[in-house]
């Protein structure tokens, strides 16, 4: 099954964070916070403006992005955990 977001929605796959602290302490899964970085796996057609025009999204498939800790809605598609969020919930695109 494939998932296709509508309008200004974006599908993001979380990127795993480091499991060890800078001091070498292993962080157990129960204490680790949800990652706030991810990779865009699908984008909608664009945001519908008040004038009726459709503005293309700034992010594209493959972009690595930063988003808020509580952004988006968790969904499970074919046993894969994904996030559905609005483009406005994305704070930055990671480059390099």
From Swiss-Prot:
Presence of the UniProt keyword Secreted in the record: no
Family matches, as PROSITE patterns: CHAPERONINS_CPN10
GO biological process: chaperone cofactor-dependent protein refolding
UniProt GO cellular component terms: cytoplasm
Superkingdom classification of source: Bacteria
One Pfam family of this chain: Cpn10
GO molecular function terms listed in the Swiss-Prot or TrEMBL record: ATP binding; metal ion binding; protein folding chaperone; protein-folding chaperone binding; unfolded protein binding
Location of the protein in the cell: Cytoplasm
Family the entry assigns: Belongs to the GroES chaperonin family.
PANTHER family assigned: 10 KDA HEAT SHOCK PROTEIN, CO-CHAPERONIN GROES
Primary role: Together with the chaperonin GroEL, plays an essential role in assisting protein folding. The GroEL-GroES system forms a nano-cage that allows encapsulation of the non-native substrate proteins and provides a physical environment optimized to promote and accelerate protein folding. GroES binds to the apical surface of the GroEL ring, thereby capping the opening of the GroEL channel.
Subunit structure as annotated in this protein's UniProt entry: Heptamer of 7 subunits arranged in a ring. Interacts with the chaperonin GroEL.
Name the record gives this protein: Co-chaperonin GroES
Organism: Nitrosococcus oceani (strain ATCC 19707 / BCRC 17464 / JCM 30415 / NCIMB 11848 / C-107)
């Amino acid at each position: 099954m494939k998932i296709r977001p509508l309008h200004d929605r974006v599908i993001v796959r979380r990127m795993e964070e480091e499991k060890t602290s800078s001091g070498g302490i292993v962080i157990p899964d129960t204490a680790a916070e949800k990652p706030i970085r991810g990779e865009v796996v699908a984008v909608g057609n664009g945001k519908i403006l008040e004038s009726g025009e459709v503005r293309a999204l700034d992010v594209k498939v493959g972009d690595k992005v930063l988003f808020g800790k509580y952004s988006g809605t968790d969904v499970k598609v074919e046993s894969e955990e994904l996030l559905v969020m609005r483009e406005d919930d994305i704070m930055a695109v990671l480059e390099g």
